[in-house]
């Protein structure tokens, strides 16, 4: 979706299939400093959707915030609707106060709060619901359950939001 319109670069850690692509950089969130990659690429926009240990990601985002404060660069942080997971039975909106009971939601809140030191024009927080894709683990799990006739657990009276990987990339583009 984005490739025809922008010079795109990415990072990988365990997906070695990207190692031969010149627009991908090896980056281990636990051992490497993200600024090494950022200073090579000199991006105008960083889309942050890292995986890895929570504290290593928090440290990475501290480096990114410091960089963005001093350079012509913006950050789109891919967060999660888990920042509202304490509110099970009604919808939450972007202006609502975050409150999470899960470690994952609290971790995302910690990074979101670190971004508040930036000028509002320098960052966007995209709080994603469950994201499904053709080869996503959640999709594969549901397909396997349907194929085997295994019941799929549902949660009545709970608001659930979902999107697809393709719809997400379209929305990032616009």
Regions found by a protein language model. Give the residues of each.
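Conserved catalytic-core motifs of eukaryotic protein kinase domains, centered on the activation segment
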Residues: 21, 56-59, 86-90
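Non-catalytic, hydrophobic alpha-helical segments
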Residues: 168-172
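NAD(P)-cofactor binding segment of oxidoreductase domains
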Residues: 37-77
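SDR active-site strand-loop-helix element
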Residues: 11, 49, 75-81, 126-128
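Residues at the starts of beta-strands that form the adenosine-phosphate
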Residues: 5-9, 74, 122
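Catalytic helix-loop patch of NAD(P)-dependent Rossmann-fold dehydrogenases
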Residues: 83-126, 133
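N-terminal Rossmann/SDR dinucleotide-binding element
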Residues: 1-45
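NAD(P)-dependent short-chain dehydrogenase/reductase
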Residues: 113-160, 167
